[in-house]
């Protein structure tokens, strides 16, 4: 008796591009334009964080777009692709889901754009994964830097001390 799920035998799609950005614009010709690729978020606070923030009872909300372009997706029609996120020292939580249909399948590639409202609790690296059938396809991290109210942003060529 074969106890292996046949979906586990399918090769996973290959990642061509995966990044966080401000937005993704699709032109009339179908070409995707990624606006401002980011790998970190700096929050410059106007007042100190409340003490309960460290206990995860208060969070800062931040909107982010995650874009990925996948190849070799033919075997995954009708499946949902999910974006999962993990805060520093925490487990993964589902952030969003997109159903893969043929209409989103131009020339052998699949582009997925997840727009998520993230609840950020404390500074550090937040990990994100795109999954299909609970199998990880790609992982990217986003660093959260929280600047205290008394520290301003550094200008170009300046180092923050």
Segments (PLM) and residue ranges:
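Contiguous segments within soluble domain cores/interaction surfaces
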Residues: 2-132, 136-161
């Amino acid at each position: 008796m074969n106890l292996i799920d046949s979906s586990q035998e399918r090769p996973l799609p290959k990642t061509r591009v995966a990044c966080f950005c401000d937005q993704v614009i699709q032109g009339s010709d179908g070409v995707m334009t990624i606006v401002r690729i980011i790998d970190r978020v700096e929050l410059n606070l106007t007042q100190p964080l409340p003490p309960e923030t460290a206990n995860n009872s208060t969070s800062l909300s931040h909107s982010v777009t995650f874009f990925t372009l996948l190849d070799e997706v033919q075997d995954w029609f009708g499946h949902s692709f999910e974006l999962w996120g993990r805060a520093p020292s925490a487990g993964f939580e589902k952030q969003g889901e997109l159903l893969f249909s043929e209409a989103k399948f131009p020339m052998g590639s699949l582009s997925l754009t997840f727009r998520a409202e993230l609840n950020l609790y404390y500074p550090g690296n937040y990990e994100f994964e795109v999954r299909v059938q609970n199998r990880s396809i790609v992982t990217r991290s986003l660093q959260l830097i929280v600047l205290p109210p008394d520290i301003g942003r550094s200008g170009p060529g300046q180092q923050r001390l």
